[in-house]
Amino acid sequence: MNLIQTLEAEEIARLNKTIPDFSAGDTVIVNVNVVEGSRKRVQAYEGVVIAKRNRGLNSGFIVRKISSGEGVERTFQTYSPLIASIEVKRRGDVRRAKLYYLRERSGKSARIKEKLPARTKAAAASAA
């Protein structure tokens, strides 16, 4: 591990952020710290992750949502101090790492199938 990777790993450990395991296709709720004048509040941004970029401290992800009939995308830096928390609401079952094709789709064709948790042998035996 070189010096830059070591420094980035130390900085990530110092930030002590709990980032859930999510990927493209998942529906997430990102709570963002918003400063308006002297007031500070938390704003929730809910949408589908269409891209995730894993670059250590420079990691980021793009969340897309439909707001009053118009598609809105927002890029978040994973370790940004503006992000209060990230919550995974729903797992999506997709076959691509980048879901940029959703930009051209609307309505039912833009839906993503839900990924159901894998059945264990004990659960399968009790169901039979």
From Swiss-Prot:
PROSITE patterns: RIBOSOMAL_L19 (PS01015)
Entry GO MF terms: structural constituent of ribosome
Keywords of this entry: Ribonucleoprotein, Ribosomal protein
One Gene Ontology term from the biological process aspect of the record: translation
Pfam families named in the record: Ribosomal_L19
GO cellular component, one term: cytosolic large ribosomal subunit
Highest taxon above the source species: Bacteria
InterPro entries in the record: Ribosomal_bL19, Ribosomal_bL19_CS, Ribosomal_bL19_sf, Translation_prot_SH3-like_sf
Family under the similarity heading: Belongs to the bacterial ribosomal protein bL19 family.
NCBIfam families the record matches: rplS_bact (TIGR01024)
HAMAP family: Ribosomal_bL19 (MF_00402)
General function of this protein: This protein is located at the 30S-50S ribosomal subunit interface and may play a role in the structure and function of the aminoacyl-tRNA binding site.
Name of the protein in its database record: Large ribosomal subunit protein bL19
Gene it is expressed from: rplS
